[in-house]
Amino acid sequence: MKISGSVLNDASLHATSPDRVLQTALTALRQGNFVEVLDQFNDQFTFTDHALDLEFKDKERLGEFLAKMREHFPDSDRRTTTIFNSEDCVTSEWILTATHSEPFLTRSFRKVSVCVRGVSVVQIEHGRISHWSDYYDQVQSRRYTVAASFTEWIAV
């Protein structure tokens, strides 16, 4: 996964602590260093992917989710287009591009280009991430197969 960014808002050109925490997490994510990503989170945190209707409060489970995303979308590239920040919150607008292999006809697969815009809202407390929420279009992202691995089935 590649993550790059350019800040389009002059007010956010000067990095603040919340910006640095987010950028450290995104850089580690791009490099596949999930231990470093998880180190940026508080012990008590919430990571919510609203498109997939998934919520993580456990670092091990979040690490599994991030690894599964990388496995299914190894060429993904997340580019930050705008960053807005306040005292303890960073909002990042981004574009995610990737390719996805999916079944086609009977036994073949086809590669489908993925391009989706999204927003991450990240709250920082004591220099660590306490809440991270991602918002984007589930259908365009084609991430639903990954989500199925993390959905708990309840017998009725």
Where are these regions (language model features)?
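C-terminal and inter-domain tail/linker signature
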Residues: 1-156
